[in-house]
Amino acid sequence: MMSCEQHDYIEIACLYRYPIILTLTSGQELSGIAIDTARNEDKAECIKILADNTARLVPLAHIVRMKAASDNPHFDTVTFD
């Protein structure tokens, strides 16, 4: 389960609409702009990213790492439990 501190980094990425690279539990990497948090149809908490002009929901439970794709004062790489 993601800690409150880790969740804060998700919210910061969305607030500033940072370009990010997500590494999923499957090993897949997704790149996009963090735009919001939401729940999917299964009610799982997700981060909404914009990739190739398409919004996509990624369940937070599937994320093992989030890397900022641009320099910022808040974070570079965050690893999730």
Write out the residue ranges for each language-model feature.
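Conserved RNA-binding domains used in RNP assembly and mRNA/RNA metabolism
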Residues: 2-81
